[in-house]
Amino acid sequence: NVVIGAHCDIASFVTINCADSHLKCIELANSIDRKDIVLENNVFVGSHCVIKGGVYIGHHSVIAAGTIVDTSHIPPYSLVIGNPMIVKEGYYLEEIIKNDPT
């Protein structure tokens, strides 16, 4: 299953793949490995990203273009960049606090 929350923006050429068949194909497994993927509300996924099975992306997170997401849990307000990916937890929460006029 793939669950996409409200107000998410998924750019062009993004691959969301909850199944991995390579072990079955080369006869090292009897079944295809399937894992759910969840994008909470207000997640942005840049172009040419790959999101692998078992990933849970917290709300208000940004996945930068070209990133391969293979870690199971991305906390809310994170910036995720690169391959191998780097998770900057709370990056956007810090930006919101810094720009809050109150």
Locate each region found by the language model.
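Flexible, glycine/small-residue-enriched loop-and-beta-strand segment within the central core
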Residues: N1-Y56, T67, S72, N83-P84, ...
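Leloir-type glycosyltransferase catalytic cores
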Residues: P101-T102
